[in-house]
Amino acid sequence: MKELTLNDVFDILPERAKDSNKGSYGRLLSVVGCRYYRGAAVLSSMGALRTGVGILTVCSTEEVMSAVAYTLPEATFLPRDELETADLSKVTAILCGCGLGKDEGVAQIIKNCTVPLILDADGLNSITPEDIPKKGNVIITPHIGEFSRLTGISISDIKSCPERYAKEFSEKYNVTVVLKDFDTVITSPARETAVSRFGNPGLARGGSGDILAGMIASFRAQGLSDYDAAVCGTVLHGASADLCAERLSMQTMLPHDILYDLNVIFNERGR
């Protein structure tokens, strides 16, 4: 199993072209958040914008959109009740989950999706594996507990051989799997299984996964493949968390703090 490095990330990521514009870096639609988890929408949006997506549109309730707008004036918005009739022809990826709560419309969103789809947290908890489109272009980002619910395999069995179970699920359902744990396993049907050993216990807080999902979705919206987007998002998330722990400490760091260490990684490589 390949152990990922930051060199792998920057071998994948193209430099931003001098003659580019916001349309050059994709349009991400994030169906996220509910009244109880407004912060999840904010955090996933921060993760997406800080990793370079050209246009982010947050689709949610008024109270969630207000929370995101207060924090991130760069975001655009689509009321949740307008999603079914909206023109999504320019959207290059959809993120579904991240504090969405129990939303009966999730299965329909997934069924109707014609662009790359990233499913996190409640985006996964509201469906069965059979609901996942078999056409490919789907990334799922479960932690061990969510993966256990999704597969029916016990947590102890998954922990004993995460790469095996992630690969089997990936091949059976034609998806890219980001199986989150202290070491995060990434696999897809046609690519080798890899592991990211970046990250630390300072990430063991609510909200860390929301930022990761936003980062992965951002890279997918920018045109990276499912697997490459998962690799770049996961490694950068963990590596910036390690820098953050050095700067603040694992005990006191918060999930959004890691985004202020991303610039160090990019600046060191002239990006």
Labelled PLM ranges:
Residues 1-116, 125-139, 148-271:
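Small-residue (G/A/S/T)-rich helix-start motifs and N-terminal tracts that mark the onset
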